[in-house]
Each structure stands twice: as C-alpha cells, then as structure tokens.
Amino acid sequence: MRVMAPRTLILLLSGALALTETWAGSHSMRYFYTSVSRPGRGEPRFISVGYVDDTQFVRFDSDAASPRGEPRAPWVEQEGPEYWDRETQKYKRQAQTDRVNLRKLRGYYNQSEDGSHTLQSMYGCDLGPDGRLLRGYSQFAYDGKDYIALNEDLRSWTAADTAAQITQRKLEAARAAEQQRAYLEGLCVESLRRYLENGKETLQRAEPPKTHVTHHPLSDHEATLRCWALGFYPAEITLTWQRDGEDQTQDTELVETRPAGDGTFQKWAAVVVPSGQEQRYTCHMQHEGLPEPLTLRWEPSSQPTIPIVGIVVGLAVLVVLAVLGAVVTAMMCRRKSSGGKGGSCSQAACSNSAQGSDESLITCKA
C-alpha cells in the first residue's frame, strides 16, 4: 500500500522557510480523502476536500463532468493555472492509488468482490502561534474503522490489526515515515503559512459569540438552563456551567460545535436545575474574540420561559401540516395524471452535495 500523501509535493520540498510571523492562536491544514468502490458501476468514486482551520478551500470529485481541483474560498482563487494543474494531477494520482489499495485491502480481509468498501485518509499539520509545527498527521481508515496511522513522533506507525501490519511492514521498508515527515515539517508548514497570509482577513479574524441564556421548564420542580453562543469564529470555544462557583461538568449537556452556514459557528451547553435555584448557576464562556471570559446568568425579566411542552406541540403541528400538504399535493398530482389539466407532476431529483468532511446537504430539484 503506497503512501497517500502526494509524493510530488514531497519532491518539490527544498526546506522550510525562515519563520518570522506571529499568528494569533494555532492554525491547521487538513486534507481528507475518501474512495468508495462500487462493483458493477464503474471505478471507485474519489472525493478530496481541503481545510484551513474551519474553512474549506479546495475540493475534487472524480465523478464531476470535468474532474479538477476547485477553489472553495476566495483567497485561494488567486493561485495561478499551474497550481490548479498540480492539484488536479495530485488528486487523479491519488484516485488511482486508492483504487489499487482498495483491491489490496479486500484481499487482506478476504472479502468478496461484490460488496462496496470505503478507504479514507487524512493528513495535515498544525502550526503554533510562532508559526512553527505543532503536530503532523497521516491517518487511514478502512470501512469506517482505524487502519494505520503515523505516530506523533512522525517516525513510526501504529497498525490497528494484523492486516494493517502488512501495510506497516511495507511502509517501514520504503522508509515512508521519513518522506511523510519531510512533507509535514516542510511544504505543509510552508503552504499553510502562505494560505494564512493570503486569506488573513478571513482566516485570522476573530468574531465574538452572541450570547444568551434560555430557560425551559421541565416540570414544577425542574428546569433546563441553556447557554448559547452564536455567530462566532474561529470554532474553538469553551462553555462551562458552575453552581455556586463549582464546575458542573458531570451534569452538563454539551453539543458539538456546529457550522452556522455563514462561515461562523454555534454551540450550547445545558444543565437541569431545581426550580427557584436558577440564580445559583452561571455559564462561563471563553473565546478568542472576547476581550475577557464572560459570565452569564439567566435573567428572568429579559427572557421569558420557553415551555418544552409548547415546543413539542408546535413541532407536532408543523409535522401534521407538512403531512397534510404532502397528501394534498399527491392527490393533485394523481388527478392531473389521470386526465386533469394543468400539466404533469414529476418526482423530485435528489442528490447528495458534499459540503465538507463531516456533513452532507441533500439538494432536491423538481
């Protein structure tokens, strides 16, 4: 199994640049590769997405009408034609490599040719505030499970099972860790620093969160306090609840940070409290965009309670209305198709449009 980091980039490496800039906080660059085999339906589909921090900046899809590396951020559009030609060739070579690797892995695991299988990889680097390498990554997964990964020392590998040990021996014989380390310490760092400079208005901005605390009665005896952080960038943020100054980590419900769809992020943390004791609880928030940590309380006078029962009833009404609308539409379509006037109804064509490594949006067109 060949190394999935692009060898051409490694060969272009001539050494790291002198580091003089100081960055606000740490930054990262990640590439995510996914190859999915589809027996009887052509070659495996290969998709690559690249991120700087929390911003996608490049994408490639082998199923596109004209597969090419495509910019996904304004600050990378300024790269010249040679850059995009290199990116495109890199992805096409990787697609071929993954195609071979999928066949090999199927053999390692004694799997038939009938099923579909998935090979994923991620590689990249983190920079500290001084612009120097904090950590490098090179990780692989097969059918959703860890397969093999480059260790933090960038000199050795960890195999997840006996099949991965076959790959590990081949990588060690080829001195692949040295090549990966050269790329991660050199060109990866150099590229990330260039992107941070070109896109500094976007990538190095700090937008503070919009904050509030909501109150949701559960019963006569308990209520949920939810601390909200909205519209912030970058994604890293800390939310904690305290009772009389003591952390309530064990009793806090904390959701993962989520993209808001406009380049910013959202997050909330909730805690269930005894009714009448709400003022003993405080939400504490830290973010790069805040001049100092925030402490928030629920303010009864400024924010009315939001009964959970009311929310459930409201959602139920919306569901009923949606179902009724679908039934009416179906009846109208049936009537038209059986001889009524006004044209015909066709099924909506739906497709998956991957927006990033962790989510897909379903787009339906009538």
UniProtKB/Swiss-Prot annotation:
<feature type="signal peptide">
    <location>
        <begin position="1"/>
        <end position="24"/>
    </location>
</feature>
<feature type="glycosylation site" description="N-linked (GlcNAc...) asparagine">
    <location>
        <position position="110"/>
    </location>
</feature>
<keyword id="KW-0732">Signal</keyword>
<feature type="topological domain" description="Extracellular">
    <location>
        <begin position="25"/>
        <end position="308"/>
    </location>
</feature>
<dbReference type="GO" id="GO:0042605">
    <property type="term" value="F:peptide antigen binding"/>
</dbReference>
<dbReference type="Pfam" id="PF06623">
    <property type="entry name" value="MHC_I_C"/>
</dbReference>
<dbReference type="InterPro" id="IPR050208">
    <property type="entry name" value="MHC_class-I_related"/>
</dbReference>
<comment type="similarity">
    <text>Belongs to the MHC class I family.</text>
</comment>
<dbReference type="InterPro" id="IPR011161">
    <property type="entry name" value="MHC_I-like_Ag-recog"/>
</dbReference>
<keyword id="KW-1133">Transmembrane helix</keyword>
<dbReference type="GO" id="GO:0055038">
    <property type="term" value="C:recycling endosome membrane"/>
</dbReference>
<dbReference type="GO" id="GO:0009897">
    <property type="term" value="C:external side of plasma membrane"/>
</dbReference>
<dbReference type="GO" id="GO:0030670">
    <property type="term" value="C:phagocytic vesicle membrane"/>
</dbReference>
<feature type="topological domain" description="Cytoplasmic">
    <location>
        <begin position="333"/>
        <end position="366"/>
    </location>
</feature>
<dbReference type="InterPro" id="IPR010579">
    <property type="entry name" value="MHC_I_a_C"/>
</dbReference>
<dbReference type="InterPro" id="IPR007110">
    <property type="entry name" value="Ig-like_dom"/>
</dbReference>
<dbReference type="Pfam" id="PF07654">
    <property type="entry name" value="C1-set"/>
</dbReference>
<dbReference type="GO" id="GO:0001916">
    <property type="term" value="P:positive regulation of T cell mediated cytotoxicity"/>
</dbReference>
<dbReference type="InterPro" id="IPR036179">
    <property type="entry name" value="Ig-like_dom_sf"/>
</dbReference>
<feature type="disulfide bond">
    <location>
        <begin position="227"/>
        <end position="283"/>
    </location>
</feature>
<comment type="subunit">
    <text>Heterodimer of an alpha chain and a beta chain (beta-2-microglobulin).</text>
</comment>
<comment type="function">
    <text>Involved in the presentation of foreign antigens to the immune system.</text>
</comment>
<dbReference type="InterPro" id="IPR011162">
    <property type="entry name" value="MHC_I/II-like_Ag-recog"/>
</dbReference>
<dbReference type="Pfam" id="PF00129">
    <property type="entry name" value="MHC_I"/>
</dbReference>
<dbReference type="InterPro" id="IPR037055">
    <property type="entry name" value="MHC_I-like_Ag-recog_sf"/>
</dbReference>
<feature type="region of interest" description="Alpha-1">
    <location>
        <begin position="25"/>
        <end position="114"/>
    </location>
</feature>
<dbReference type="GO" id="GO:0002476">
    <property type="term" value="P:antigen processing and presentation of endogenous peptide antigen via MHC class Ib"/>
</dbReference>
<keyword id="KW-0490">MHC I</keyword>
<dbReference type="GO" id="GO:0006955">
    <property type="term" value="P:immune response"/>
</dbReference>
<dbReference type="InterPro" id="IPR013783">
    <property type="entry name" value="Ig-like_fold"/>
</dbReference>
<keyword id="KW-0391">Immunity</keyword>
<dbReference type="GO" id="GO:0002486">
    <property type="term" value="P:antigen processing and presentation of endogenous peptide antigen via MHC class I via ER pathway, TAP-independent"/>
</dbReference>
<dbReference type="GO" id="GO:0042612">
    <property type="term" value="C:MHC class I protein complex"/>
</dbReference>
<dbReference type="GO" id="GO:0005615">
    <property type="term" value="C:extracellular space"/>
</dbReference>
<dbReference type="GO" id="GO:0031901">
    <property type="term" value="C:early endosome membrane"/>
</dbReference>
<feature type="domain" description="Ig-like C1-type">
    <location>
        <begin position="209"/>
        <end position="297"/>
    </location>
</feature>
<protein>
    <recommendedName>
        <fullName>Class I histocompatibility antigen, Gogo-C*0202 alpha chain</fullName>
    </recommendedName>
</protein>
<keyword id="KW-1015">Disulfide bond</keyword>
<keyword id="KW-0812">Transmembrane</keyword>
<feature type="region of interest" description="Alpha-3">
    <location>
        <begin position="207"/>
        <end position="298"/>
    </location>
</feature>
<feature type="region of interest" description="Alpha-2">
    <location>
        <begin position="115"/>
        <end position="206"/>
    </location>
</feature>
<keyword id="KW-0325">Glycoprotein</keyword>
